[in-house]
């Protein structure tokens, strides 16, 4: 039974005395399993890594971690990884009690959620001959309770003399827990997990009949209504299936069919499993990693081979497909633990190779890390011509692939700009520009070339980023003069805002689309939000009469200035002139637009009311999603505000805005927040590494130096103010709230594209 609530007839023992200390005297406690030489191997060539990003929720149950989904614990993972329960001994709160007929039992001292890790089954991992010897010894000694658990074929965990508290977990015919086998590093380990919600005071149990012990049958005292009366022994296959719930789902058969196979009434070859779905992929891949029986492996591989859905095949590849297939091929033609005959080995190998042919070949990363090339290479000399031919074809195709290299992560800068986020980030860059990224190595956000953060027409090409930054001027939602509704629904005031005092010489002002004033200097080719400060050269001063003739020093200064201007490349001059003309034209068009727009009418009020309602509705969902990311409180509040406003604007454009958040829309909102916050976190990580001008090399620095030198020659002291303003801007635009990305200037946009071609990121999302 599964669900959030325990059944009404749950057996509770709230008043039973805690006898943990007494129970610990009956055996030697081990912190972890001990292994006989050569036992407990997970058959993994190397430790498998996931592609989760660092953060407080990394690799948790909602992260989609490929390791967690396939019952693999992360080993070399990021800080904050939530998938290290065996390694961290993150056990549930339990104690030991004394039962009436079953001896000691394990009791929950706090509520345990469904799926939660309860305890590891710790003991001595022994081989089959040792298992038989100890069984005889324990029988001679009159041991009433056996503590054998099968780890994998031919290997057992014996917790009789040495073990952990998990040994006291009793059998039940209606258990609230179950056993799972997990890969931890290069070892296979076993843990007890909650199958449903377990109440405080309830005994933790699981079904012993799922795992073979080889002991004599014993009477069952579980007290459940469906109790079969005994456990263990040779007759256990007749009382219950020995296949776990995870393996049942992986096989794609009904429990009735599985029982028929176990009893020999049906053959697995005569049954057709269900079509493989994306939801079952993780169970199939997790089960394939364990050394199952031959008929089980055949059924699971058959489900994969018969599947024609590309999304399912992509999921199989993502869930460590190359590594698991390499493991199966190695075992099939090596020690052959499955006991396959020659015909079965050929069939299994052909199935695997033909599946590998279906998979998209983008980069060589997963192929190389799985070491499957060496395995396939050994098959090129196989006696079966079909196997040899397909193996050679795969090797030839893989040889043409390129490796992709991950850009090192940068630490978060606590003093960095909280609103400036890279417009496009790339986790990996291939050696060849013609090769695209591997879809399963990096989470890719789909691109919409026609949409910016507000749904307006903007492209993210280098030419766009080098245009006037007015295109990306953000609007702080906290500004009282900003409109409360969407830009197109509520008209801006007809009269633009004006600066409160006179501007310094050379400075002009204009209004952005929201009516907010910004300042620009055509001569210096800069623009900013802050009111410009007057430089000494432009400050008014008392006339002191006509200037006298220049001396030799003044003439030399003029000559240097003239030479500096002559040395300036024509391309830079033409680019500057083009930028100035563009700035002037945009400012003129914006001023005409503001003057031509009528004042807000009464018809805007319903839109404002609608926007207010949507804001309240979305504010109940968005902050909870944002809080999952590792950002400070103020930054989280600001990002939540921005995201809510963006989503409100989008909803108001629809004929019928939503009145409530359905499960489907909640899922899409979650994806939107994930993409938005991913950019925020990535930008913060880059700033932590001190890369304030990403991709600017020596050539870019020399170009900056030449420009600054030329400006000093032409403008003297006034350039210091310009450099100061420009420096503040390049540092992070502290006054600029985040919308679509950083406010790129000409130089940063130009140099950033020289090193890395960043993917375009679409912040547009369809909530319908």
Curated annotation (Swiss-Prot):
Residues 92-209 form the SET domain. PROSITE patterns: AWS, POST_SET, SAM_MT43_SET2_1, SET, WW_DOMAIN_2. Its EC number is 2.1.1.359. Residues 45-90 form the AWS domain. Residues 411-452, 555-568, 682-734, 755-768 have a biased composition (Basic and acidic residues). The AWS and SET domains are necessary for transcription repression. PANTHER family: SET DOMAIN PROTEINS. This is Histone-lysine N-methyltransferase, H3 lysine-36 specific. It comes from Yarrowia lipolytica (strain CLIB 122 / E 150). The lineage of its organism: Eukaryota, Fungi, Dikarya, Ascomycota, Saccharomycotina.
């Amino acid at each position: 039974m599964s669900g959030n609530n325990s059944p009404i007839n749950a057996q509770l023992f709230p008043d039973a005395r805690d006898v943990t200390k007494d129970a610990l005297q009956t055996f030697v406690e081990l912190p972890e399993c001990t292994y006989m030489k050569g036992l407990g191997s997970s058959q993994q060539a190397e430790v498998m890594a996931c592609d989760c990003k660092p953060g407080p929720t990394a690799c948790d149950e909602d992260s989609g971690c490929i390791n967690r989904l396939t019952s693999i614990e992360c080993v070399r993972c990021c800080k904050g990884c939530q998938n290290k329960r065996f390694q961290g001994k993150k056990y549930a709160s339990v104690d030991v009690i004394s039962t009436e007929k079953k001896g000691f039992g394990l009791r929950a001292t706090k509520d345990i959620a469904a799926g939660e890790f309860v305890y590891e089954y710790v003991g001595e991992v022994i081989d089959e001959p040792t298992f038989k010897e100890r069984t005889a010894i324990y029988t001679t000694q009159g041991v009433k309770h056996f503590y054998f658990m099968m780890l994998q074929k031919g290997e057992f965990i014996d917790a009789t003399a040495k073990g952990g508290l998990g040994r006291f977990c009793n059998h039940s015919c209606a258990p609230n827990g179950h056993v799972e086998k997990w890969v931890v590093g290069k070892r296979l380990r076993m843990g007890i997990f909650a199958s449903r919600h377990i109440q405080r005071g309830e005994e933790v149990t699981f079904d012993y009949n799922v795992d073979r012990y080889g002991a004599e049958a014993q009477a069952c005292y579980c007290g459940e209504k469906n109790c079969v009366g005994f456990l263990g022994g040779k007759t256990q296959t007749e009382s219950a299936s020995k296949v776990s719930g995870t393996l049942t789902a992986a096989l794609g058969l009904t429990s009735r069919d599985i029982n028929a196979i176990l009893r020999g009434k049906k053959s697995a070859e005569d049954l057709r499993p269900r079509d493989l779905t994306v939801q079952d992929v993780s169970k199939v891949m997790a089960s394939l990693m364990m050394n199952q029986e031959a008929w089980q492996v055949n059924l699971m591989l058959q489900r994969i081979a018969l599947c024609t859905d590309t999304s399912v095949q992509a999921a199989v590849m993502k869930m460590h497909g190359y590594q698991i297939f390499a493991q199966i091929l190695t075992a099939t033609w090596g020690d052959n633990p499955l006991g396959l005959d020659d015909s079965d080995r050929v069939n299994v190998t052909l199935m695997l190779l033909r599946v590998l042919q279906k998979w998209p070949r983008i980069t060589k990363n997963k192929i190389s890390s799985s070491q499957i090339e060496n395995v396939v290479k050994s098959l090129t000399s196989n006696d079966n011509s079909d196997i040899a031919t397909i193996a050679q074809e795969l090797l030839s195709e893989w040889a043409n692939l390129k490796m992709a290299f991950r850009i090192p992560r940068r630490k978060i800068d606590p003093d960095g700009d909280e609103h400036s986020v890279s417009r496009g980030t790339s986790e990996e860059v291939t050696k060849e520009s013609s090769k695209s990224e591997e879809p399963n190595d990096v989470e890719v956000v789909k691109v919409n070339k026609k949409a910016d953060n507000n749904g307006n027409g903007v492209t993210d090409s280098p030419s766009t980023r080098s245009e006037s930054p007015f295109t990306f001027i953000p609007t702080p939602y906290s500004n009282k003069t900003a409109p409360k509704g969407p830009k197109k629904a509520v008209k801006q005031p007809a009269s633009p805002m004006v600066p409160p005092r006179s501007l310094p010489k050379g400075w002009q002002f204009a209004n952005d689309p929201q009516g907010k004033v910004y300042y620009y200097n055509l001569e210096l080719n800069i623009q900013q939000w802050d009111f410009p400060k007057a430089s000494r050269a432009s400050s008014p001063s008392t006339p002191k009469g006509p200037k006298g003739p220049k001396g030799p020093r003044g003439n030399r200064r003029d000559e240097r200035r003239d030479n500096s201007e002559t040395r300036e490349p024509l391309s830079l001059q033409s680019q500057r002139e083009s930028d100035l003309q563009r700035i002037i034209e945009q400012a003129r068009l914006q001023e005409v637009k503001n003057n031509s727009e009528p004042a807000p009418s009464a018809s805007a009020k319903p839109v404002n009311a609608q926007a207010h309602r949507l804001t309240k509705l979305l504010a109940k969902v968005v902050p909870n999603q944002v809080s999952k990311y590792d950002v400070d409180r103020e930054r989280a509040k600001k990002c939540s505000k921005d995201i809510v406003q963006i989503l409100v604007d989008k909803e108001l454009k629809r004929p019928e805005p939503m009145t409530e958040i359905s499960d489907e829309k909640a899922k899409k909102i979650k994806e939107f927040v994930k993409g938005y916050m991913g950019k925020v976190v990535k930008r913060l990580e880059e700033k932590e590494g001190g890369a304030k001008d990403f991709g600017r090399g020596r050539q870019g620095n020399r170009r900056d130096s030449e420009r600054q030198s030329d400006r000093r020659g032409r403008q003297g002291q006034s350039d210091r103010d310009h450099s100061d303003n420009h420096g503040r801007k390049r540092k992070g635009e502290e006054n600029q709230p985040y919308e679509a990305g950083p406010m790129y200037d000409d130089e940063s946009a130009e140099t950033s594209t020289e090193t890395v071609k960043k993917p375009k990121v679409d912040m547009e999302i369809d909530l319908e």
